[in-house]
């Protein structure tokens, strides 16, 4: 099974991905659950991620950004995601193809058909379940310290947020919007409880995990 978490920077998706991975690891065993992230997931990708996050006052144009993240996705897909799925494990990814659509497509204005074509080229797998964590722009920006590479400004993140909402509306069979209202611990775990309940309702007795 392939599960992805999506949302704007600072929405809380990384925390929720980690919490779900721990829940499923406790349930099925750590060796049956793979947690990865984009950009990242492999030693090469983590080096590139570190370099990107260390940039200040440096902007990539939309196409350059798209091609860079697409190449990193291919590396992560063939080294982490696909092997995990073929082994019958539960793979949880903090970001996947929907992020490219929302960020480079809706956020940067890159042609959506081009984004879709490149996504299909490098990763011909569609997630079984996608949890989109929705938080206000104000809350998300207050949660995270964005560097020069990430900090596009509130208007950009508003476009990205609307992009994620459009993705959810267009893919109701796999995408589930989860509202996140605050940073309070009780709200974080309340969100986790909602995700677990939704996961159990979706999978029921259908989930098969490799021994």
Swiss-Prot record:
Please provide one cellular component term from the Gene Ontology annotations of this protein: cytosol
- Binding, ATP: 7-14
Give the source's domain of life in one word: Bacteria
CDD domains registered for this protein in UniProt: TMPK (cd01672)
What the entry lists under NCBIfam families is as follows:
DTMP_kinase (TIGR00041)
Q: Which PANTHER family did the record assign?
A: THYMIDYLATE KINASE, UMP-CMP KINASE 2, MITOCHONDRIAL
Q: What is this protein called?
A: Thymidylate kinase
Organism of origin: Anaplasma marginale (strain Florida)
Q: Which gene encodes it?
A: tmk
């Amino acid at each position: 099974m392939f599960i992805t978490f999506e949302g704007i920077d600072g929405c809380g998706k990384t925390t929720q991905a980690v919490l779900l991975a721990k829940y499923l690891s406790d349930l099925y065993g750590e060796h049956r659950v793979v947690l990865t992230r984009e950009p990242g997931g492999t030693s090469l990708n983590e080096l590139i991620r570190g370099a990107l996050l260390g940039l200040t006052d440096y902007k990539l144009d939309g196409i350059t950004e798209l091609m860079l993240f697409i190449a990193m996705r291919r590396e992560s897909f063939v080294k982490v995601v696909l092997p995990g799925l073929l082994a019958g494990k539960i793979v949880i990814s903090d970001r996947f193809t929907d992020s490219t659509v929302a960020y480079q497509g809706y956020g940067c204005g890159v042609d959506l058909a081009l984004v879709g074509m490149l996504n299909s080229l490098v990763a011909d797998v569609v997630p079984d379940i996608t949890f989109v964590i929705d938080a206000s722009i104000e809350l998300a920006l207050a949660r995270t310290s964005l560097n020069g590479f990430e900090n596009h400004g509130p208007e950009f993140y508003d476009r990205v947020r609307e992009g994620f909402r459009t993705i959810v509306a267009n893919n109701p069979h796999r995408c589930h919007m989860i509202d996140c209202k605050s940073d309070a611990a009780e709200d974080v775990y309340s969100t986790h409880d909602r995700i677990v309940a939704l996961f159990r309702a979706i999978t029921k007795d259908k989930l098969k995990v490799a021994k």
